[in-house]
Structure formats: structure tokens, C-alpha cells
Amino acid sequence: MTAPALSPTLELACELINRPSVTPLDEGCQQLMSQRLAACGFAIEPMHIEDVENFWAIRGNEGPVLCFAGHTDVVPTGPLQAWQNPPFSARIDEQGMLHGRGAADMKGSLAAMVVAVERFTADHPDHKGQIAFLITSDEEGPAHHGTKAVVERLRERGQRLDWCIVGEPSSTSLVGDVVKNGRRGSLGGTLTVRGQQGHVAYPHLAKNPIHLAAPALAELAAEHWDDGNAFFPPTSFQISNLNAGTGATNVIPGTLEAVFNFRFSTESTVEGLQQRTAAILDKHGLDWSIDWALSGLPFLTEPGDLLDGVAKAIRSVTGRETTPSTSGGTSDGRFIATLGTQVVELGPVNATIHQVDEHILASDLDVLTDIYYQTLVNLLAC
């Protein structure tokens, strides 16, 4: 019995999954996408930055720009023997599940974007505005030479970006049930508290940084940073790593190091969080220093052309009302939003992302393709 033919989206998704593009590698994924886009009239601009492959593609000459953004890199597989199916050999099982690293995050979305645009440009060759793609192989890694760097080049040349759909797996149970219309900011820090090393039997000759820091860390953890707002939950503070000691049981350590992170709403600022943290540490009389690292500022896309167009497309294709959300971690949307762009994240169900045996319902990618296509119709059809 002959296996049923795959849809164009599933064919492309399988081709992309079969390429072992563990971050920051691309393994030819972008070339495959670029060839397809060039065939329907896109101008392709590869951007090789350090060890990262990126490309910018655009079709049209004037009017508002709808950009599709995403990444071809995937996270490492973990132990291969733990996978039921080789991670870079796409397979659709008897239950209709598409297996492979990147099926959900986010090669499935990339395939849906390309096929949706191929259909739209064939049906509407003289569409309004412009369609663009911003694709990187540096999202799952440090993310220094990917979308962030490409956005800076676009900013320097004055490239407008009105609307952007990022293909992150936003859905929770059914495709389109949730879209991300913003993300919290992420501010990390490494706190060093200095004491005086000594013998545990002679504490009066030492200063134990663990004892000194504990009340301050407890106060930081209990602090009410803000109330959040209608779009964001309250800002959170979490300690992720705590290190002190030499490994010996009879030595008071000389220093303590605590790694922490703020996920912050638009009700707080970087400067405000830093100042309040410093005030608490100073109140406890600590000898301290912090190495701060800002991963991204919070951004929010309020109801408007893009969010309305996406919600209308989801309703038209699935009959469902979508729920906008700002929950979850950071994404490359934080870089694109700095251009003043309306940004929405819309992709497959995220239940197995970054896991062994990553998989999604294969038919969901055809639904996603239809949603992307209908969004193009809603925003750019003449």
C-alpha cells in the first residue's frame, strides 16, 4: 500500500528537520528556504556574521512590511539512545505525529511560512505592501550574531518593519489557541559577596559571607517589585545558582556567589531594579558587587492591525478565538520590537519543545499554513 502523499508544508518541514542544524549551524536550511522564496520574487540578502548564517529577503517596493521571522538552528538532541526515532530523520507515525528535532521549534513554522507565502504570491501577485523574511541560525545559542545583529543593520539603513510574525511555538493545546503579543524583560546578575576566609572553630577571626548574605537574599526573594498590569504578571526575582566554600568542612569561605534573574514587566525599569537591589544589599552592610546582564527589554503589541489580523485568521481557519499572552521566556521578538514593530509570535503546540522525542501533530502544520496565508490576505490582499 502506497503511503499518502505529504502536503507541501510537510514535505518542506521534513527536509528541514533532516538537516542536523544544532546551534549555531544551519546545514543548508536557509539556502533551501532562499531558493523557494527567490522563485516567487523575493530579493535575497545572505548575512554571514561571525559563525552565524542569516538572511533577509523582501518582496515588493513600497507600503507596509509584513515580516516572517524565525530560526533554523535547534537545541542539542541529548542522548541519542533516548530517542525512539533518530532526531534528524523526520518521521510521521501511525498516530499522525511528526517526530524530529525542530518539528515544533521551529522548522515546522518555517515550512508553513514559506508555503503560505508561495500560495499567497501566486494568488495575489500584485499584493499591497511588502513581505519579508528575517531568518537566523543563532537563536538557541548566545543570540549575539543573529536577529539582534541583522536588526541593527536594518536600523542603520532605515528599513521599515511594520508587522512581524515570529514562528515560535506559542500554542498550548490546539494550533492558534494562544499567541504571544509580548514578552517580559530579562535582567540577570551575578552577585559576589566578600567575607573573610577562616577556620570554622574560630569564627571570630573570619567573616562568613553565607551568613552575611542570607538575610539579604531572603529579602530580595520576598520583595514585591511591582503589581504587573493588564498585560504582564508582576515582576519576579529568582536565584538560580548559589556557590560558596572550598569543599572542606572546616573552612569558612571567603566569598559567596549568587546568580539571579529578574523577569520584569513594563511596570519596572532596568535602572529601578538595579537601584532597589543595591539598596537592599547596602542595608545589610555587605561588601558586594554585581555583574549585570540584560537579555532583553519587555515589549508589548496591543490590539491593532497585526493582532487583529492574526486573530481574525485564526477564527476563520479554526473557528477558535485566540488568547494573547506575554508568558514564557524571551524570544527574538525582543530585538525586532526595538524597531517600533508590532510583533506577534504564532506557531505550533509547544508541549515537547527541547525534549527528547520532540513531536507535533503533523496536520497542525497545514492548519498553521492556512492561518499564515489568511493573515497575509487580511493585511496585504488588494
UniProtKB/Swiss-Prot annotation:
UniProt keyword Zinc, yes or no: yes
Gene3D superfamilies in the cross-refs: Zn peptidases
Entry keyword Metal-binding: yes
Keywords: Amino-acid biosynthesis, Cobalt, Diaminopimelate biosynthesis, Hydrolase, Lysine biosynthesis, Metal-binding, Zinc
Residues noted as binding Zn(2+) 1 in the record, renumbered to the chain: H71, D105, E168
EC number: 3.5.1.18
Superkingdom to which the source organism belongs: Bacteria
Cofactor: Zn(2+); Co(2+)
One Gene Ontology term from the biological process aspect of the record: diaminopimelate biosynthetic process
Positions of the catalytic residues: D73, E139
Pathway: Amino-acid biosynthesis; L-lysine biosynthesis via DAP pathway; LL-2,6-diaminopimelate from (S)-tetrahydrodipicolinate (succinylase route): step 3/3
One Gene Ontology MF term: cobalt ion binding
Residues binding Zn(2+) 2: D105, E140, H354
InterPro entries xrefs: ArgE/DapE_CS, Bact_exopeptidase_dim_dom, DapE_proteobac, Peptidase_M20, Peptidase_M20_dimer, Peptidase_M20A
Details of cofactor binding: Binds 2 Zn(2+) or Co(2+) ions per subunit.
Swiss-Prot/TrEMBL catalytic activity: N-succinyl-(2S,6S)-2,6-diaminopimelate + H2O = (2S,6S)-2,6-diaminopimelate + succinate
CDD domains (UniProt xref): M20_DapE_proteobac (cd03891)
One Pfam family it belongs to: Peptidase_M20
Function in brief: Catalyzes the hydrolysis of N-succinyl-L,L-diaminopimelic acid (SDAP), forming succinate and LL-2,6-diaminopimelate (DAP), an intermediate involved in the bacterial biosynthesis of lysine and meso-diaminopimelic acid, an essential component of bacterial cell walls.
Subunit structure of this chain's protein: Homodimer.
Family: Belongs to the peptidase M20A family. DapE subfamily.
Identification of the protein by name: Succinyl-diaminopimelate desuccinylase
Gene: dapE
